[in-house]
Amino acid sequence: MTATLKKPPIYKVLYFQVLTAVVIGVLLGHFYPSLGVDMKPFGDAFIKGIKMLIAPIIFCTVVLGIAGMEDMKKVGKTGGLALLYFEIVSTIALMVGLVVVNVLQPGAGMNIDPASLDTKGIAAYTGPGKMGTTTEFLLNIIPSSAVDAFAKGEILQVLFIAILFGFALHKFGGRGTMVFDLIEKTSHVLFDMIAIIMKFAPIGAFGAMAFTIGKYGIGSLFSLGKLMGSFYLTCLLFVFIVLGIIARLNGFNIFKFVRYIKEELLIVLGTSSSESVLPRMMEKMELLGAKKACVGLVIPTGYSFNLDGTSIYLTMAAVFIAQATNTPMTLLQEVTLLAVLLLTSKGAAGVTGSGFIVLAATLSAVGDVPVAGLAIILGIDRFMSEARALTNLVGNGVATIVVAKWTGELDQKQLTRALNRDDWIEAQEPEMILDHQQDKMR
């Protein structure tokens, strides 16, 4: 047993491979921009490979979790507490962004005339139909057909189907039935497929980063460096102070948690999409002691309702545009902006570019800030996407552990052991460790 738990050489560890790939991608994109842009298919292929399995993995995980539960009341309790947590923490994130941007004022002194801006680049984000109403968003959770939900990879629609299927399967016997066993075996196969695809994560991160630097250039980072610096600083403060306090109150350390998911963070840094590690995060949250049913409900739901990084970005970007264009905003107008963002931010999925679409829709709805001002930040939005995705990922991970503890679905001893023994966690693939733990339980 000691041999199987031996820590592998550094060059075989995924986070080292991804970090190296990201650095190489940055260098290639900077010194050979055209070649860097040509590397885009590598990043796209990796993300598509992960996305093709997200829907079936969510379905299997949620169905197994719900159908295998003894007390079905816990499902409703878990969902209710998760939504309550999402709303509270998202509101805090919006407020933190609003406070910091008013204190640092990164847009002050730019004196940009909105009429002089070239708005052709933002037309794709501000066109009609890009952002639906709240009613349309809620109705869209119900798919037109089950096949359509899986074909399009709509996370909330798949989650809706999985919850219904899980309840129905529980009614007909749940654990021990042939259908349950089939779904359980299918789940193992799907996670094995994810493990295979994750071997190519360094190549995907390299391609995505080389493209980003090659297309937009490092120079674009400096032109609006104050906004980027303020945003990255705010995200760090939110993660290590706000989420840090929440973590401490619930019995774990945020620094150890971030270290625990460092591989996933590096992959997200390279791809700018938190969806690229969704299946792996579900595995790792189970390894921390959260039960499958809780993980299956909280993680997928959080990808639409608990986007802390996107929330920070939305308030900071909106007020920054107002400052840069010398558009005065009263306290009432900022509170109104906050209230509108509480609704519109829920429509931002965990994919690249969604935050910009939501920002465009919000500015159009509020009317106080010129929508043309979006052209100011269009060039650096891709670089800010990394911080959004990273903060979203940490936020959803913390939310899962917190909700699991609130509902009594967390093994505190396993949580402590996993966070304190990262060498044991890194020694093997997550699915191998899960199998090892299940064998011990038997």
Curated annotation (Swiss-Prot):
The keyword Cell division does not apply. PANTHER family: AEROBIC C4-DICARBOXYLATE TRANSPORT PROTEIN (PTHR42865:SF1), PROTON/GLUTAMATE-ASPARTATE SYMPORTER (PTHR42865). This is C4-dicarboxylate transport protein. InterPro entries: C4_dicarb_transport, Na-dicarboxylate_symporter, Na-dicarboxylate_symporter_CS, Na:dicarbo_symporter_sf. The lineage of its organism: Bacteria, Pseudomonadati, Pseudomonadota, Betaproteobacteria, Burkholderiales. NCBIfam families: PRK01663.1 (NF002461), PRK13027.1 (NF009587). Keywords: Cell membrane, Membrane, Symport, Transmembrane, Transmembrane helix, Transport. Gene3D superfamilies: Sodium:dicarboxylate symporter. The chain crosses the membrane at residues 13-33, 49-69, 81-101, 149-169, 193-213, 227-247, 312-332, 336-356, 357-377. It is a multi-pass membrane protein. GO terms for biological process: L-aspartate transmembrane transport. It comes from Polynucleobacter asymbioticus (strain DSM 18221 / CIP 109841 / QLW-P1DMWA-1) (Polynucleobacter necessarius subsp. asymbioticus).
